[in-house]
UniProtKB/Swiss-Prot annotation:
<feature type="transmembrane region" description="Helical">
    <location>
        <begin position="24"/>
        <end position="44"/>
    </location>
</feature>
<feature type="transmembrane region" description="Helical">
    <location>
        <begin position="298"/>
        <end position="318"/>
    </location>
</feature>
<feature type="transmembrane region" description="Helical">
    <location>
        <begin position="492"/>
        <end position="512"/>
    </location>
</feature>
<keyword id="KW-0813">Transport</keyword>
<comment type="similarity">
    <text>Belongs to the major facilitator superfamily. Proton-dependent oligopeptide transporter (POT/PTR) (TC 2.A.17) family.</text>
</comment>
<feature type="transmembrane region" description="Helical">
    <location>
        <begin position="339"/>
        <end position="359"/>
    </location>
</feature>
<protein>
    <recommendedName>
        <fullName>Protein NRT1/ PTR FAMILY 4.1</fullName>
    </recommendedName>
</protein>
<dbReference type="GO" id="GO:0022857">
    <property type="term" value="F:transmembrane transporter activity"/>
</dbReference>
<comment type="function">
    <text>Involved in (+) and (-)-abscisic acid transport (ABA) and in gibberellin import.</text>
</comment>
<feature type="transmembrane region" description="Helical">
    <location>
        <begin position="461"/>
        <end position="481"/>
    </location>
</feature>
<keyword id="KW-1133">Transmembrane helix</keyword>
<feature type="transmembrane region" description="Helical">
    <location>
        <begin position="204"/>
        <end position="224"/>
    </location>
</feature>
<dbReference type="GO" id="GO:0016020">
    <property type="term" value="C:membrane"/>
</dbReference>
<feature type="transmembrane region" description="Helical">
    <location>
        <begin position="413"/>
        <end position="433"/>
    </location>
</feature>
<keyword id="KW-0472">Membrane</keyword>
<dbReference type="InterPro" id="IPR036259">
    <property type="entry name" value="MFS_trans_sf"/>
</dbReference>
<feature type="transmembrane region" description="Helical">
    <location>
        <begin position="93"/>
        <end position="113"/>
    </location>
</feature>
Length: 515
């Protein structure tokens, strides 16, 4: 359903981009390198914040957990705003530099606070108003920056290749998601080691240096990039189409009028017959067929986006209850070495990195071009949703075994029992999020690609927020979730998520077939 329009790009001087000189694989590769560095910083901070809020800023554990969840959720939710700015007012390059700088300033504020004792509460006291102001200003400056960076960088990298070469664009998004996972792997291994052995203040300092280096690397590649000039606010165009269609709702539109409108328009989109009521917007001479097709295409993406939120709600458990489970298991590999709880995601991330590399190196030789179309990405997302349901069922079974051994035999089971659910959830995340990034980029109008690819991250945010709501609702009704896992009914909560995601899978299949 993609709108196929002739794309015009410029170089950094505003002249027409030259094929072979501007854009290409090298320019797209820079986006992958930068994403590795930026995501390592973001996830290292997310991991570090829990200890920082409780040990240094003296917040209670529940308060700190809520602060971290809200920070992560807000960061991903703001990707839709970052994508909107990149599509509407700035080039995607300029949007990255702007939001990357905001993220860096926020990180510098928290780094200074971590090193200056006057900016930290003393003697176990709660932080003062000025201290809290510095903390939350820095924290949400990072969230705004992360939202803008993740909302603009994937589309910028995709622009360097374009959509005509389907194999290359598919390969880019696989390697881009590989970069996301690589950054995550470095965060839960190298950065966790630094935090636990050198200190969280050093972790902040290193994160600041890495992010500054990422921005420098990205800007240094400017001469080889190609840029797409923003086409104005896509949301304004969508609203105008709806307003025009509403005003002309009582007028009759003939097929001849629709064909004439499409013929007179410069739009070269593949016309489709969904949301026919929008055709009435074309009776307004100020509304072009291109605007109507943009609106129609974007609307068709929303059910796919909405069908992935429950899956991300399940993935959110890897950072909450699954971590709690890890704390009450046997994590010792030897007498002197114990696996840090924050590093439990290392093995799943390693599996994801291996799977992505093997798929890109060997899988693409098996698949034909037709299989790598939008239908392939829809199937990929569907497989991810199905695997999520299975993983939640497995998580429930593992929790039953863990609790039985702990309560009846006073034995801590090995932490590697949990790795199965971690691996399965990580693989489902890889299939779904990776599929969404490529699907939304390829299927969206060229003028809305940043905002459309941001839908993938926005789904993650809404999944995290929904997880918080579900925990409150389920616990308020049933009382299943308590501080002591051995007295909780966590396995029943996992089964609730399994059932909800399975119902959601059928909902997704319905919309995917209609697409």
């Amino acid at each position: 359903m993609q709108i196929e329009m002739e794309e015009k790009f410029e170089d950094w001087r505003g002249k027409e981009a030259i094929s072979g000189k501007h854009g290409g694989i090298k320019a797209a590769f820079i986006a992958c390198v930068v994403e590795t560095m930026e995501n390592m910083v973001f996830l290292a901070c997310s991991t570090n914040f829990m200890m920082y809020f409780t040990k240094s800023m003296n917040y209670s554990t529940p308060k700190a957990a809520t602060m971290v969840t809200n920070f992560v959720g807000t960061s991903f939710l703001l990707t839709i705003f970052g994508g909107f700015v990149a599509d509407s007012f700035l080039t995607r390059f300029a949007a990255f530099v702007l939001f990357g700088s905001i993220e860096l300033l926020g990180l510098i504020m928290l780094t200074l606070q971590a090193h200056i004792t006057k900016l930290q509460p003393q003697g176990g006291k709660k932080p003062s108003t000025p201290q809290s102001t510095v903390l939350f200003t820095g924290l949400y400056a990072i969230a705004i920056g992360v939202g803008g960076v993740k909302g603009s960088l994937p589309a910028h990298g995709g622009d360097q290749i374009g959509t005509r070469n389907q194999r290359l664009i598919s390969g880019f998004f696989n390697w881009y998601f590989f970069s996301v996972c690589l950054g995550g792997f470095l965060a839960v291994t190298l950065m966790v080691w630094i935090e636990e052995n050198i200190g969280w203040s050093s972790s902040f300092t290193i994160s600041t240096a890495v992010l500054a280096s990422a921005i420098f690397v990205f800007v240094a590649g400017c001469p080889m990039y190609r840029f797409k000039r923003p086409a104005g606010s896509p949301l304004t165009r969508i609203v105008n189409v709806f307003v025009s269609a509403a005003r002309n709702r009582n007028r009759f539109v003939t097929d001849a009028e629709v064909v004439t409108q499409n013929h007179n328009s410069t739009d070269k989109s593949i016309h489709h017959n969904k949301f026919k009521f929008l055709n009435k917007a074309k009776l307004n001479n100020k509304i072009s067929a291109t605007q109507v097709e943009e609106t129609r295409t974007f609307l068709a993406l929303l059910p796919i986006f909405g069908s992935t939120i429950i899956m991300n709600c399940c993935v959110a458990q890897m950072g909450t209850f699954s971590v709690q489970q890890g704390m009450v298991t046997n994590r010792k590999l030897s007498r002197s070495f114990e696996i840090p709880v924050a590093s439990l995601n290392a093995i799943p991330l390693l599996c994801m990195l291996s799977s992505l590399a093997l798929y890109e190196l060997f899988g693409k030789r098996i698949l034909s071009n037709s299989e790598r179309s939008s239908s392939f990405n829809l199937k990929r997302i569907g497989y991810g949703l199905a695997l999520t349901s299975i993983s939640m069922a497995v998580a429930a079974i593992v929790e039953v075994k863990r609790k039985h051994e702990a309560v009846h035999n006073n034995i801590k089971i090995s932490v590697f029992w949990l790795e199965l659910q971690f691996v399965m959830l990580s693989l489902s995340d890889m299939l779904t999020v990776g599929g969404m990034l490529e699907f939304f980029f390829r299927e969206s109008p060229a003028s809305m690609r940043s905002m459309s690819t941001a839908l993938g991250w926005c789904s993650t945010a809404m999944g995290f927020f929904l997880s918080s709501v579900l925990v409150e609702v389920v616990n308020g009704i049933t009382g299943w979730l308590r501080d002591d896992l051995n007295e909780s009914r966590l396995e029943l909560f996992y089964l609730v998520l399994c059932v909800l995601n399975t119902l959601n899978l059928f909902n997704y299949i319905f919309w995917a077939k209609r697409y």
